[in-house]
């Protein structure tokens, strides 16, 4: 619910209402919301209670700056270690099988599967842990703004290019492609945010 785009940014999560909706005890709801607050997905304020986090342009840039640093370092470890990433290959194969009607959530899930596979292949516990800490906020960006993900063929082609670069083993080319890929994603997300703010102004 938090990451599927059904809640508007800033929506209040009233304990009584959501406990009933989800069929869980209120203390379970409180424990779950605290976990999501710690992950940056929810925020608690004195007057408004628990709300879905609202990301601004600075948040997006900050999240993707950390994401880029982690993924580029993971790429270095993968290429210099000559590691194989079958899960990334599988994600690209699934991308290739998508039609134009694929849901944004399907595209986002494959996108994250690809990038998560790269992180996992680096075989670094600390990179993995750091990436896990920001992954929920990456997904929140995508859920709230959703640009680009309605063009599955374009997203598939980008990830195919990234995979081919990794397999070719040219570190500089691959790093540059990943930086461009994530830089374009940051720009798409911030543009979508600006467009949304203009509509609601």
Language-model features, listed with the residues they occupy:
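Amphipathic alpha-helical dimerization/coiled-coil segments
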Residues: 71-100, 106
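Short linear motifs at protein or domain termini
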Residues: 1-83, 186, 190-201
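Hydrophobic packing residues in well-ordered alpha-helices of helical domains and bundles
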Residues: 63, 85-91, 107, 111, ...
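C-terminal all-alpha effector/ligand-binding and dimerization domain
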Residues: 89-96, 136, 143-201
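Hydrophobic residues in alpha-helical segments
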Residues: 2, 78, 99, 122, ...
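Positions in alpha-helical segments
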Residues: 50, 61, 73, 93, ...
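Hydrophobic, amphipathic alpha-helical faces that serve as interaction scaffolds
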Residues: 66-80, 112-150, 188-189
């Amino acid at each position: 619910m938090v990451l599927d785009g059904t809640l508007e940014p800033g929506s209040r999560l009233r304990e009584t209402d959501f406990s009933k909706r989800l069929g869980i005890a209120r203390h379970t709801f409180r424990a779950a919301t605290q976990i999501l607050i710690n992950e940056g997905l929810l925020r608690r304020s004195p007057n408004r209670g628990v709300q879905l986090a609202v990301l601004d342009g600075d948040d997006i840039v900050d999240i993707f700056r950390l994401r880029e640093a982690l993924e580029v370092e993971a790429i270095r470890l993968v290429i210099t270690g000559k590691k194989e990433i079958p899960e990334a290959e599988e994600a690209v194969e699934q991308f290739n099988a998508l039609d134009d009607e694929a849901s944004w959530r399907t595209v986002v899930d494959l996108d994250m599967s690809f990038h998560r596979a790269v992180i996992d292949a680096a075989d670094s516990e600390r990179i993995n842990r750091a990436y896990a800490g920001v992954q929920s906020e990456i997904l929140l960006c995508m859920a709230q703004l959703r640009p680009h993900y309605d063009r599955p063929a374009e997203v598939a082609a980008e990830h195919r290019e990234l995979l081919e670069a990794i397999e070719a083993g040219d570190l500089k080319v691959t790093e540059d492609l990943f930086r461009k890929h994530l830089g374009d994603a940051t720009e798409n997300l911030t543009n979508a945010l600006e467009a949304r703010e203009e509509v609601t102004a």
